[in-house]
A protein has these predicted regions:
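Short, charge-rich amphipathic alpha-helical segments embedded
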Residues: 3, 19-51
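TPR-repeat structural position
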Residues: 15-16
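Short, charged low-complexity intrinsically disordered segments located at boundaries
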Residues: 36-38, 50-56, 71-72, 107-110
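Alpha-helical linker/edge segments of TPR/alpha-solenoid repeat scaffolds
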Residues: 43-65
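Charge-dense, extended regions
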Residues: 69, 73-77
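Eukaryotic intrinsically disordered, low-complexity regions
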Residues: 83-113
Length: 113
């Protein structure tokens, strides 16, 4: 569900705040469901939401993915909100926060039955 606060940020065309809220949703909901919903909403209203990929290094060695790498990538996302970085970060978050995401999915399943 997209919050009223997020909708207000998008309506105000506040790119920085919108990007920060999107970034934060990676950690709040590591299933990425919230991020995907928020991104869909924002990209439909903010044509300048995405930037070009800056070409900076992306850690592709899965064995090195940990919270430190994830946090570095989250910080970089705010200033380089590119589709390339988002796609990479989705993979990193899915791996690093795999346990947390599983707990959330289980809870959602239990609540829906």
């Amino acid at each position: 569900m997209v919050s009223q606060e997020f909708k207000a940020s998008v309506a105000d065309k506040n790119l920085l705040r919108t990007r920060i809220m999107l970034k934060d949703s990676f950690v709040v909901d590591p299933t990425l469901a919230q991020f995907d919903e928020m991104l869909s909403y924002a990209s439909g209203h903010l044509p300048d939401l995405f930037t070009q990929f800056d070409g900076e290094y992306l850690e592709n060695d899965i064995s090195k993915w940990n919270r430190d790498v994830m946090n570095e990538e989250l910080v970089r996302l705010v200033t380089n909100f590119s589709k390339t970085r988002i796609d990479h970060l989705k993979k990193v978050v899915s791996k690093v926060l795999e346990t947390e995401a599983a707990k959330i999915r289980k809870k959602r399943t239990e609540q829906s039955t």
